[in-house]
């Protein structure tokens, strides 16, 4: 078991293919699965609301969301196993689930709790957004990569993988965030509510983070020996 993150040189075409597949898997399966889970869960809640007791409606919506998210996370782990050229296994599926779902839920609740504290710092709203969500992108990407590294038996090389992918995702999120801000999409700025600026910037920045982080992860998995 190696203790450092060593990679082998592969052809540029293979490197591009691995990066593209890693980005596609992360955007379509992992991030896309989370969005689809929210949509299906919301549709379930709306379809059942008023027809069955409220507590049952909420429970069923949560179950639908959970099942969909768990499935997409497991599928992502299996896809990354293919990129790493190892047999698809329950171990990799569980790595996909445990690396993504707990940290995502923790950050959702943690950000809600931290929001009033951060607002008391009197920072502009667009800076509060950046301070909260750039580290969140790093944590989600890093934790997901760490779980995959451990499942692959990389030992102490797994944290190096997590750091590489986490920083890549965070920098991509920050670049997109600041780029949109320069183009007039400033969170909390003039007309922000009418254009749903916060949701739009969050979605596009997360998309950038998923693309960059997934590409880095896919390329590293393909090169690792």
Language-model-derived ranges and their functions:
Residues 2-225:
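Juxtamembrane/disordered regions of integral membrane proteins
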């Amino acid at each position: 078991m190696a203790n450092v993150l060593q990679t082998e040189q592969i052809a540029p075409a293979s490197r591009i293919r691995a990066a593209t597949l890693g980005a596609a898997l992360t955007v379509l399966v992992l991030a896309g699965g989370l969005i689809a889970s929210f949509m299906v869960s919301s549709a379930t809640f709306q379809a059942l609301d008023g027809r069955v007791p409220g507590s049952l409606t909420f429970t069923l919506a949560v179950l639908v969301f959970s099942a969909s998210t768990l499935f997409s996370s497991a599928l992502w782990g299996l896809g990354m196993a293919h990129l790493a050229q190892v047999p698809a296994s329950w171990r990799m599926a569980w790595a996909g689930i445990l690396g993504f779902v707990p940290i995502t839920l923790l950050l959702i609740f943690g950000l809600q709790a931290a929001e009033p504290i951060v607002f008391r710092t009197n920072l502009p709203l667009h800076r509060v957004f950046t301070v909260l969500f750039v580290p969140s992108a790093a944590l989600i990407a890093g934790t997901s990569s760490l779980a995959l590294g451990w499942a692959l038996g990389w030992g102490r090389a797994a944290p190096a993988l997590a750091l590489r992918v986490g920083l890549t995702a965070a920098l991509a999120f920050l670049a997109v965030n600041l780029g949109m801000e320069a183009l007039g999409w400033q969170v909390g700025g003039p007309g922000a509510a009418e254009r749903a600026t916060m949701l739009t910037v969050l979605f596009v920045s997360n998309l950038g983070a998923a693309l960059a982080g997934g590409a880095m992860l896919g390329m590293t998995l393909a090169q690792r020996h």
